[in-house]
Amino acid sequence: MKIILWLCVFGLFLATLFPISWQMPVESGLSSEDSASSESFASKIKRHGEGTFTSDLSKQMEEEAVRLFIEWLKNGGPSSGAPPPSG
């Protein structure tokens, strides 16, 4: 039992000698990863916003093309001689 106690005391002694010097490079590495992560996050938000705008615009253009096509069909469609709307 005394051996376990002495090993614990020795381990605590060693832990007081080396903790800060071994942890410093890890923290500096994390801070650079955090900044890269935040830049990546910002670019993803921007891309998502642009993609949402493009998606909404594409949806509106498709709806307009469908509306024009239905009007063309109502006005006689292929038998009217007018070309179908391009969209």
UniProtKB/Swiss-Prot annotation:
Tissues showing expression: Expressed by the venom gland.
Transmembrane segments: none
GO biological process: regulation of blood pressure
InterPro entries xref list: Glucagon_GIP_secretin_VIP (IPR000532)
Cell location: Secreted
One Gene Ontology term of the molecular function aspect: hormone activity
Cellular compartments per GO CC: extracellular region
Signal peptide: 1-23
Transmembrane is among the record's keywords: no
Propeptide: 24-45
Pfam families assigned: Hormone_2
Family statement drawn from the similarity comment of this UniProt entry: Belongs to the glucagon family.
Role description: Venom protein that mimics the incretin hormone glucagon-like peptide 1 (GLP-1). It stimulates insulin synthesis and secretion, protects against beta-cell apoptosis in response to different insults, and promotes beta-cell proliferation. It also promotes satiety, reduces food intake, reduces fat deposition, reduces body weight and inhibits gastric emptying. Interacts with GLP-1 receptor (GLP1R). Induces hypotension that is mediated by relaxation of cardiac smooth muscle.
Record protein name field: Exendin-4
